[in-house]
Structure formats: structure tokens, C-alpha cells
């Protein structure tokens, strides 16, 4: 028992360390969450993503305010934290980590209570040592919150279809289920994809003979949904009547032309590419052992994969809510025990998760967060112009400025990148996000800033993987780059070129630009 407790504390500590790591997994963890909240609560200027523009109104403020609003309210009482973007970021990640651990301790056991103690221990151990638990679940993705909503839903539903409870009316659970359904839908429009098949089974087994309970579920869902609609209508205030964000989001995503902007993938991407990446060696257990067909969780897996694969924009994080189900719902057989107890499986599982945890929890695009966290300490009135090139979009809320101008590269209808909308006349407190544009556009940006008479500091933030490209920039003879700061733990996986091994160089460097 003592040995188990020490092992548990060690895993918790590893999770805490990675939770507080500087990695930056995907722009949406900032722009669909903290960026919006910081602008609401702290009145800083930042980047409004398309989903939160009144024209689209495709994301609900309700779940964000419900999950993170209390934390921001508490932080208002601590100015030393409220003014420090790194502390705000890590506070939010810590909250997510704690919420997931609570779910792990109180809800996951209910999904595996029919298993033998030894099997429960193995499944819980696999889930706790998954890199997804340490990274994706702690970052501020809507997918992370969707996981909690899905597990909560399935826990309640499993309880309702239990033979002991099937004859009861279950008014309380019906009300709870309606509230979670509403929250899940307004948090992410993909939530119904996971619960569609489980809902059909629940209706057939329970609600077709308990119509009063079904009425309560509908009433609860409608009431909470109306509250979310009123919140969004008040905030967006776009003059178009009531704002129903899940409906707007669904309409947007059903248009293939819209999805092309974000990237189209083959429909098998989730099944053949993303699934192996997200569960690793557990996939072997799934292949050899299969899943329990008498559990609603299995149908949530099938339902989620089926409906999410229908859409051609398929990112790995969309499958994050399935990870707990893919692990805990395995059909445990003697072959499963034999495989898990083999040293090669244990070693492969640990190696897979250590590597993925290092990438996703510590080094992936981490220089961005480190620089903006440091910038808080050395910022001055003469910020000048910060040009970001070949990095993920900087989370501009971390500048903590109420006087910030953000310009960005745009793609024209012909797919051509353009800097025509960059505010070259703004020479101070200006962030220019050039994303992954080619070198000529970077050169043109610097040239036009110079032509507009910019005498304030010009700063270039770019990964060390661009060493070869920067040498070409210097050959121009009119530009000199002086390294000011360097961050070793920055992994750029987006610009790897096997014909140029300098693109594998880790790190991010902040340069001062001198115009000769």
C-alpha cells in the first residue's frame, strides 16, 4: 500500500510539472479561451478570433465564464498575479489539472466498478500515466472541458440504465443530465457526436417508459440553453436577434469552403493517424481485447469516431475526450493481462508517454510562452514593433497592454499571402504576426516599416530552425540582426526540411533589427 501511494504521488508530481510547463500545443488553447477572457476581465487588447466576432458568433461565452470566470474573479484580488501573464496561464492550467484529477478519482471508478480490483488498478494507472492527462487535459482547450462533460454524462447515464435503477423515475439524474447536455453543446458543437448513440440506448432502455423524467430532462436542457443564449446575445449584441452559437458553428463547419481555410484531411485521419498518436501502445490492447458492447462508453467511442470522421477537418485534439474511454472500457481478457505484464509493453508505454510528454508538455513552441512571460519583467514604454515569423501566433493577451495594435498576414481568395492589412504607420506597441510566410514577405515588411519612418525598436522573434533563411536576409546588406534573447526549449515541428538539417535546430531567438 505504501509503495502504491509513493508511486501515485510521483505521477501526480510529474503531472504537476508538465502542467506548469511552457509548451504551446495549439493556438486555440489561447485564442478560444484566455485571449477572450483576458479581454473581458482585464480590459487588455488582443486578438479576437473569427469564432468570437459578431459576424460569426460561433463560440459561446457561457461555458468559459462558468469554468474560468470564478478563477479570474479570485485573481482580481491578487494584483501581483493579475498583472503577470505567466502566473495567470499557469493558474488556469493548474485548475484544469485539479478538475481532471477530481474526475479521475470520483467518476472514472464508477465506469469500471464491475472490474476486478487488479484490473481497475491497471486501467487507472494507464490513464494516469498517459501524456494526454499531463498535457492536453491541463491546457485550456475546450476539448479538455469536453472530456469532463462527457465522463460526467456517461457516469449519470450508466447509473440510469443500471438494472437496479431502471424501474425508478430518476428525476434528479434527468435534471443533471439536461444541464450537462446543454453545457456540453454550448462548450463544443462536437459534444452531441460523442453522446448520440448512448442517448439512443438510454432512451430505449429508460426514457420510453419514464416520460415524466424525459420531460424534466428536456426542461432542464431548455432552461440552461436559454441562459447560455441570453448571455451570448447580450455580449455579442450584433443586432440579429437571439444568438445561438452552436447552430452558427455547425452552419460554418458544414460548409466545406470554410473548412478549407483551416485545412482539409482525409476522412480516415482520425482512425489511422490521430488515434495511434493519442493512445499509443494501448491500441494493441484494443486490437487484441476489443471493447465491452454492454457499456454506453463503447458506443460513445463508436459514435464519436463515426461523426467526427464525417467532417474533413480532423485534428488530434478532437479525440482527447475519448482517451479515458479508450483506456477504461477495454474488454479485459487473460491475453490483456499477459500483454500488460510484459516488460516490452511497460517499457514501450513509458517511453511513448515520456517522449510525447516532453514534446507536448515542455518543448513544443515553448519559446513563445517563455519570451512573453519574460517580457512582462523587462517591458518598457518603447516596445516598438514585434515581428513574429515562422512561429505559432503569439497569444497577444500576454503583452498585458491596453494600447496594443495587432496586425496579421492574410490569405487572399487566390490563396496568396498578403501584408496589405498590416498597419505600417503604427510604430509602437505593435505586434505583427507573419505566421509561416516566405522570406520575401518578411523582407518586404521590414522595408515598409523603414519607409514609413519607424524609429522605434524593431524586434524579430523567430525559431532557430530558420537559421539558413536568416542568413539570406542578412545578405541583403541593409539589415543586421542582433541576438538579444535565446530560449533553448522551443521545438518547431512545422518547418522541418530533410534537405536542410539546420531546420531541426531547437530554440527560439529574439533579435533586434538594425537598418543599415
Swiss-Prot record:
Coiled coil: none
Keyword Transferase: yes
Alphabetical UniProt keywords: Endoplasmic reticulum, Glycoprotein, Glycosyltransferase, GPI-anchor biosynthesis, Membrane, Transferase, Transmembrane, Transmembrane helix
Cytoplasmic compartment segments: 27-60, 197-210, 292-295, 339-348
Region forming the signal peptide: none
EC class name: transferase
Cellular location(s): Endoplasmic reticulum membrane
Gene Ontology CC terms: endoplasmic reticulum; endoplasmic reticulum membrane
Residue intervals passing through the bilayer: 6-26, 61-81, 176-196, 211-231, 271-291, 296-316, 318-338, 349-369
Superkingdom, taxonomy of origin: Eukaryota
Biological processes annotated in GO: GPI anchor biosynthetic process; plasmid maintenance
The enzyme's E.C. designation: 2.4.1.-
Primary location: endoplasmic reticulum
Protein name (database record): GPI mannosyltransferase 4
Amino acid at each position: 500500500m505504501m509503495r502504491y501511494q509513493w508511486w501515485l504521488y510521483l505521477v501526480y508530481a510529474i503531472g504537476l510539472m508538465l502542467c506548469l510547463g511552457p509548451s504551446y500545443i495549439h493556438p486555440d488553447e489561447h485564442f478560444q479561451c484566455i485571449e477572450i477572457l483576458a479581454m473581458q476581465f482585464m480590459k487588455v487588447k488582443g486578438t479576437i478570433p473569427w469564432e468570437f466576432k459578431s459576424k460569426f458568433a460561433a463560440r459561446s461565452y457561457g461555458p468559459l465564464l462558468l469554468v474560468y470566470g470564478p478563477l479570474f474573479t479570485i485573481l482580481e484580488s491578487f494584483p501581483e498575479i493579475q498583472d503577470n501573464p505567466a502566473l495567470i496561464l499557469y493558474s488556469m492550467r493548474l485548475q484544469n489539472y485539479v478538475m481532471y484529477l477530481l474526475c479521475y478519482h470520483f467518476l472514472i471508478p464508477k465506469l469500471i466498478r464491475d472490474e476486478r480490483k487488479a484490473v481497475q488498478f491497471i486501467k487507472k494507472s494507464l490513464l494516469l500515466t498517459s501524456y494526454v492527462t499531463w498535457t492536453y487535459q491541463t491546457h485550456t482547450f475546450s476539448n479538455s472541458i469536453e472530456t469532463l462533460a462527457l465522463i460526467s454524462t456517461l457516469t449519470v447515464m450508466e447509473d440510469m440504465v443500471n438494472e437496479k435503477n431502471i424501474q425508478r423515475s430518476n428525476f434528479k439524474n434527468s435534471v443533471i443530465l439536461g444541464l450537462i447536455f446543454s453545457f456540453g453543446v454550448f462548450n463544443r458543437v462536437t459534444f452531441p457526436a460523442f453522446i448520440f448513440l448512448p442517448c439512443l440506448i438510454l432512451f430505449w432502455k429508460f426514457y420510453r417508459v419514464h416520460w415524466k423524467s424525459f420531460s424534466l430532462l428536456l426542461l432542464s436542457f431548455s432552461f440552461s440553453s436559454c441562459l447560455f443564449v441570453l448571455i451570448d446575445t447580450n455580449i455579442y449584441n450584433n443586432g440579429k436577434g437571439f444568438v445561438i452559437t452552436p447552430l452558427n458553428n455547425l452552419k460554418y463547419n458544414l460548409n466545406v469552403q470554410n473548412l478549407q481555410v483551416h485545412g482539409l484531411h482525409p476522412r480516415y485521419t482520425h482512425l489511422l493517424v490521430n488515434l495511434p498518436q493519442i493512445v499509443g501502445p494501448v491500441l494493441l490492447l484494443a486490437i487484441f481485447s476489443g471493447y465491452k458492447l454492454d457499456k454506453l462508453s463503447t458506443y460513445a467511442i463508436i459514435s464519436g469516431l463515426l461523426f467526427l470522421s464525417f467532417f474533413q477537418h480532423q485534428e488530434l485534439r478532437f479525440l482527447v475526450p475519448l482517451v479515458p474511454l479508450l483506456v477504461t472500457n477495454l474488454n479485459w481478457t487473460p491475453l490483456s493481462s499477459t500483454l500488460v505484464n510484459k516488460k516490452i509493453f511497460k517499457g514501450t508505454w513509458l517511453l511513448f508517454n515520456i517522449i510525447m510528454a516532453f514534446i507536448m508538455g515542455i518543448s513544443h513552441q515553448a519559446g513563445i510562452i517563455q519570451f512573453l512571460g519574460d517580457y512582462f519583467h523587462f517591458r518598457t514604454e518603447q516596445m516598438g514593433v514585434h515581428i513574429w515569423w515562422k512561429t505559432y501566433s503569439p497569444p497577444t493577451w500576454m503583452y498585458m497592454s491596453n494600447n496594443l495594435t495587432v496586425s496579421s498576414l492574410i490569405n487572399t481568395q487566390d490563396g496568396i499571402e498578403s501584408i496589405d492589412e498590416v498597419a505600417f504607420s503604427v510604430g509602437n506597441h505593435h505586434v505583427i504576426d507573419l505566421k509561416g510566410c516566405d522570406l520575401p514577405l518578411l523582407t518586404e515588411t521590414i522595408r515598409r516599416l523603414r519607409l514609413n519612418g519607424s524609429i522605434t525598436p524593431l524586434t524579430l522573434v523567430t525559431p532557430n530552425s530558420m537559421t539558413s533563411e536568416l542568413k539570406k536576409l542578412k545578405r541583403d546588406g541593409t539589415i543586421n540582426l542582433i541576438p538579444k534573447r535565446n530560449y533553448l526549449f522551443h521545438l518547431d515541428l512545422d518547418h522541418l526540411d530533410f534537405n536542410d538539417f539546420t531546420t531541426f535546430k531547437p530554440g527560439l531567438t529574439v533579435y533586434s533589427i538594425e537598418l543599415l
